[in-house]
């Protein structure tokens, strides 16, 4: 019996979509089922950084940090529209302390007990030297020192912070990263099925028979192999749906963020160290806002929607107020979001200490292979996919070689420093666009922005204006090409325009999308 596909991937987050893209590009037939919107769970709720993970050096996770540092620049070249370099300012004060549970702090307590848990400047310099050199940096500038008493980055900070270090990492639009991987997988032959839940799986004559539920419709497809990339639900799928006896576990860790009005008058980020040894970031966000996070809290149930608790919000506010000249309060918070990280359960004593590295395990006990993905960072998703394919390849004939390094995602076929030129060209071809609107479109769609606007001579040609520069032309593109079905998909995942739209505008958008979907379905049925 010929199966419907080689791989059935469960989960449409960054790991599932990354594996789907890689596998489809190697000639495998791929189906991917995601029970909700593409990239709507963990992958939509990160701190939105492509970074090596400076703090992971304290846990001696050198392999993870090196791999992530190398990947920063590989990914930057492949998606310069949704990812870009940023400089991070790390203020230092003699009161800085280690998290006393880290391997580094335990070692120093033995060899240098007089330090009493302090995090000295020389040790930060050493860590940043490693950070600059572990990954063979080629594009990003290296570490420098700042005098906060005279540098603009010192304005807005408590004057007790006089010195700082500055290093490089990258921003990424996480939700768009997932969608673009799904689109590219589909362009290479994969079948992407959002809002389709896997409700059962059994092995018959060496093939997986997987039951899918979409709305009130149920069907079964067959596959040679199942890939369990269900994120927070990976354990449930492994032992429930796939009926595996594997003891591999997942630790659910909730990370919460707050968004305030813009706190600083420059475009650099801050890496703030707490007196408890933890760190948070303060990052320029959507031009007019500042993103602050994250927390690390154990989360008991993947089916319980993650939401910031009052204690987490107070923690983030108190933490950043230790650095600000002008404190903020709950009244300054305009939005919050939380996500659950499905970390491999390595028995760590705290959520912060749990490894961020990925673990991939294959089980053949049911009579057909199933691969499960635990953990991972958004920065290493492409390497995770390559590693998964290394484990998958011997189950199939004629699997092509690795190929994804540096291959652009949709809209990313332009130089890393080419955004300004694209914005200029877009404004020339569509003169009704403002500077800010054109930049938003380029940052979202890259070279495809012109394709989306093709034929428009005036603003009216873009159709209904929903507010915040969102028009019917763009929404139609998102529905036709990017799997969007609801207003929430559009304003909180494909974009962050929900920060600039009120409830009435979002309701109007939802009504329009419902009508448009009905009209499209009726036309397709004729």
Predicted region positions:
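Glycine-rich active-site loop/strand segments that organize a redox cofactor
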Residues: 39-66
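Glycine-rich FAD pyrophosphate-binding loop
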Residues: 24-44
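C-terminal accessory subdomains/tails of enzymes that are appended
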Residues: 36, 82, 97-104, 114-118, ...
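Beta1/beta-strand and adjacent pyrophosphate-binding region of the FAD-binding site
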Residues: 2-13
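Core beta-strand elements of the Rossmann-like FAD/NAD(P) dinucleotide-binding domain
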Residues: 3-5, 216-225
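A conserved short coil-to-beta-strand element within the FAD-binding core of flavoproteins
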Residues: 194-208
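N-terminal Rossmann-fold NAD(P) dinucleotide-binding loop
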Residues: 16
